[in-house]
């Protein structure tokens, strides 16, 4: 058996359950500790999945932890990732990497300087459908592609998330940061980097029941 990485999970909210359930199918890493600014959330995860709960700072400085799984709210991604890297740990974050391009570039520079890996959701472009599309493009089955689009509609994060408030923040909130990465990642993977960016928007109702 190859190396098993010891992982510390930060952010014991809604998405953490998905990672805890999925990680049992992999034999190259193990979540051994968890942390959250809400200590009760961390204790609940620790009890459910039979691991240790510690404070966020303790986890980030823990020499046993090799990889930090960053599942905090978007506005906290940059700070947790930066502290993790500076403490010599590889990082995998939920999307987005950061809420500004400047902060994202800084994280990449730190990772390169420290010779660490930093990864980020979504990894959905590695799924069967996207990879088949990539194969067809590589084989030029459909000729040269000139245009691609992604369409998404749903009633809002408040329709399923138990704590949707952070996703309505003026900075670090909204559908572009929440759902946009899935479509942008797929399009960039299939068509290459964007040369220009523009947008249109629709003014939505000012009030929404949460």
Residue ranges and their predicted role:
Residues 124-202:
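Predominantly a Rossmann-like dinucleotide-binding segment in NAD(P)-dependent oxidoreductases
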Residues 201-210:
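Single conserved hydrophobic/aromatic residue that forms the stacking wall/gate
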Residues 42, 80, 107, 133, ...:
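Aromatic/hydrophobic pocket-lining residues that form π-stacking "cages" and hydrophobic walls in ligand
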Residues 1-49:
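N-terminal Rossmann-like dinucleotide-binding module
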Residues 106-123, 144-147:
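Rossmann-fold dehydrogenase core element
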Residues 33, 66-67, 147:
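Short, Asp-centered acidic motifs that coordinate Mg2+ and/or phosphate
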Residues 19, 51-110:
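Beta-loop-alpha module in the N-terminal Rossmann-like domain of NAD(P)-dependent dehydrogenases
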């Amino acid at each position: 058996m190859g190396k098993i990485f010891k992982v510390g999970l930060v952010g014991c909210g809604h998405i953490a359950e998905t990672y805890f359930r999925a990680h049992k199918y992999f034999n190259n890493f193990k979540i051994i500790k968890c942390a959250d600014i809400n200590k009760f959330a961390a204790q609940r995860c620790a009890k459910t999945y039979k691991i240790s709960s510690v404070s966020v700072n303790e986890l980030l400085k823990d020499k046993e932890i090799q990889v930090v799984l960053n599942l905090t709210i978007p506005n906290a991604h940059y700070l947790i990732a930066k502290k993790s890297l500076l403490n010599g740990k590889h990082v995998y974050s939920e999307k987005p990497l950061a809420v500004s391009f400047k902060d994202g570039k800084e994280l990449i520079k730190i990772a390169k300087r420290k010779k660490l890996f930093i990864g980020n959701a979504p990894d959905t472009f590695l799924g069967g459908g996207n990879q088949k599309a990539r194969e067809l493009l590589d084989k030029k089955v459909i000729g040269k592609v000139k245009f691609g689009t992604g369409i998404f509609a749903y009633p809002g994060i408040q329709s399923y998330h138990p704590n949707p408030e952070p996703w309505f923040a003026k900075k670090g909130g909204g559908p572009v940061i929440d759902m946009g990465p899935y479509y942008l990642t797929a399009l960039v993977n299939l068509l290459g980097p964007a040369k220009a960016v523009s947008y249109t928007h629709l003014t939505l109702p000012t009030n929404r029941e949460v």
